[in-house]
């Protein structure tokens, strides 16, 4: 687990997300507290629980992005789920325990990738031997193998086609065991059970020497790895470092005096309670305790209020962070300052057609103004509005770019207003188009 200080975490998030300092600070402290807990010994380590976070703010201001970037930064298993996808146990649909099962799958992939890196050098040598076997046969003399090995390493054989045998990882037939809890835990994979007994199935693939290396290195890495050890490590990582982001939590809040669908909504909240508080979930790899998994919930709370959530669930989300609606200046900074801003993306996309795109400062001001106006008059969808506006402005250039190789387009405020001004003024039209 990374041991960035809260200040470093915030400055890393600043590269991708504009503003929202309170939210960044809250998640930075939460992440640092995970690291602090890892340094504790024995009983105290067990007692320290993560402080779960509730983010409140309109759509498109960076709630999901903050969590996504945080998980990348931490190198921790992370799943993002929509609260609306789940139903109360007993109804048709996914139950909330599936969240933990998904988290374990993510952790296994993470741990396997890390372990593969550790054995990469050895796996590379083994892969080279298998390529030589395919080229000259297993019975070739050492001298022949050495001469071919030199050619291989010089890249002379890259385009030669060879046949290689690799492990067959096809899912094979699987069946559901009736009466087992959860959606996936009861699915036993027959090929998993029989594969070990039969010594593993292989299949032959035709490929070039160059393309065969990644496949063979993965195959050889997996042979060098202890799968049971990976699973045990993944279960530990899930329990100690897992992060779950629950989006749209306001949609399962029962409105005051609301009837009808409220029952199953409240049911989802009730099912979430033990998960957030700490329970043991059965997965096909073994039981997972959720006591130390960090939960970050977020919602716009347009119609409902945080106080409409079940009181017990509110108590289990002790840190409240409010995210602000974006201002004109924020839009400007989103277009210019972020690491992979929309403007940089469009310039890079046009460069693939050998078309140069220049966007002036007054054009950026005009784009920000239009985005703010539309959010105020039509519907506030936050930073996502910029994508709609940019796409509309660059529509003509994107369409004709292949025919204009070598051309340079300068986009200024007049161009932006010409393309979008009339639509933005006509509220009825912009409701449908922008």
UniProtKB/Swiss-Prot annotation:
* Family that this chain belongs to: Belongs to the ClpX chaperone family. HslU subfamily.
Residues bound to ATP: 18, 60-65, 247, 312, 384
What is the annotated localization of this protein? Cytoplasm
- NCBIfam families (UniProt xref): hslU, PRK05201.1
**PANTHER family annotated for this entry?**
ATP-DEPENDENT CLP PROTEASE ATP-BINDING SUBUNIT CLPX-LIKE, MITOCHONDRIAL-RELATED, ATP-DEPENDENT PROTEASE ATPASE SUBUNIT HSLU
Q: What does this protein do?
A: ATPase subunit of a proteasome-like degradation complex; this subunit has chaperone activity. The binding of ATP and its subsequent hydrolysis by HslU are essential for unfolding of protein substrates subsequently hydrolyzed by HslV. HslU recognizes the N-terminal part of its protein substrates and unfolds these before they are guided to HslV for hydrolysis.
**How is the subunit organization of this protein annotated in UniProt?**
A double ring-shaped homohexamer of HslV is capped on each side by a ring-shaped HslU homohexamer. The assembly of the HslU/HslV complex is dependent on binding of ATP.
Please give a single GO biological process term from the UniProt record: protein unfolding
Matching InterPro entries: AAA+_ATPase (IPR003593), ATP-dep_Clp_protease_ClpX (IPR050052), ATPase_AAA_core (IPR003959), Clp_ATPase_C (IPR019489), HslU (IPR004491), P-loop_NTPase (IPR027417)
Recite the UniProt keywords alphabetically: ATP-binding, Chaperone, Cytoplasm, Nucleotide-binding, Stress response
SUPFAM superfamilies attached to this UniProt entry: P-loop containing nucleoside triphosphate hydrolases
GO terms for MF: ATP binding; ATP hydrolysis activity; peptidase activity; proteasome-activating activity
- Major localization class: cytoplasm
Record organism: Brucella anthropi (strain ATCC 49188 / DSM 6882 / CCUG 24695 / JCM 21032 / LMG 3331 / NBRC 15819 / NCTC 12168 / Alc 37) (Ochrobactrum anthropi)
- Cellular component GO terms held in the UniProt record: HslUV protease complex
Which HAMAP family does the protein's record reference? HslU
Give the signal peptide range.
none
Protein name in the entry: ATP-dependent protease ATPase subunit HslU
């Amino acid at each position: 687990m990374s041991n960035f200080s809260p200040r470093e975490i915030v400055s890393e998030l600043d590269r991708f997300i504009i503003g929202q300092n309170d939210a960044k600070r809250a998640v930075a402290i939460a992440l640092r507290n995970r690291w602090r807990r890892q340094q504790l010994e024995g009983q105290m380590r067990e007692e320290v629980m993560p402080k779960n976070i509730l983010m409140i703010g309109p759509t498109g201001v960076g709630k999901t992005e903050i969590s996504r970037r945080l998980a990348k930064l931490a190198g921790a298993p992370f799943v993002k789920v929509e609260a609306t996808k789940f139903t109360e146990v007993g109804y048709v649909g996914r139950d909330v325990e599936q969240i933990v099962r998904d988290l374990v799958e993510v952790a296994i992939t993470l741990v396997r990738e890390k372990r593969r890196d550790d054995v990469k050098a050895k796996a590379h040598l083994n892969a080279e031997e298998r390529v030589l076997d395919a080229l000259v046969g297993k019975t070739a003399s050492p001298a022949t193998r050495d001469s071919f090995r030199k050619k291989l390493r010089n890249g002379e054989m890259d385009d030669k086609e060879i046949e290689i045998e690799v492990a067959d990882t096809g899912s094979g037939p699987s069946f559901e065991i009736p009466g087992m809890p959860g959606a996936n835990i009861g699915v036993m994979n027959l090929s998993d059970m029989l594969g070990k007994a039969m010594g593993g199935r292989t299949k032959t693939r035709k490929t070039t020497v160059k393309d065969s290396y990644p496949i063979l290195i993965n195959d050889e890495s997996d042979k060098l790895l202890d799968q049971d050890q990976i699973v045990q490590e993944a279960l530990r990582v899930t329990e100690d470092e897992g992060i779950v982001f629950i989006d749209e939590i306001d949609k399962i809040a029962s409105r005051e005096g609301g009837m009808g669908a409220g029952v199953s909504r409240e049911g989802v909240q009730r099912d979430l309670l033990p998960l957030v508080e700490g329970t043991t979930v059965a997965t096909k790899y073994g039981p997972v305790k959720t006591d130390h998994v960090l939960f970050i919930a977020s919602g716009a709370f347009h119609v409902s209020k945080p106080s409409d959530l079940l009181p017990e669930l509110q108590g289990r989300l002790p840190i409240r962070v409010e995210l602000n609606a974006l201002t004109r200046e924020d839009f400007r900074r989103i277009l210019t300052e972020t690491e992979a801003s929309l403007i940089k993306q469009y310039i890079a996309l046009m460069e693939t057609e050998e078309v140069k795109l220049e966007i002036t400062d007054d054009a950026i001001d005009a784009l920000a103004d239009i985005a703010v106006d539309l959010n105020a008059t039509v519907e506030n969808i936050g930073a996502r509005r910029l994508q709609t506006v940019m796409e509309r402005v660059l529509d003509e250039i994107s369409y004709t770019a292949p025919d204009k190789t070598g051309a340079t387009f300068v986009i200024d405020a007049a161009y932006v207003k010409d393309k979008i001004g009339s639509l933005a003024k006509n509220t009825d039209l912009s409701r449908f188009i922008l």
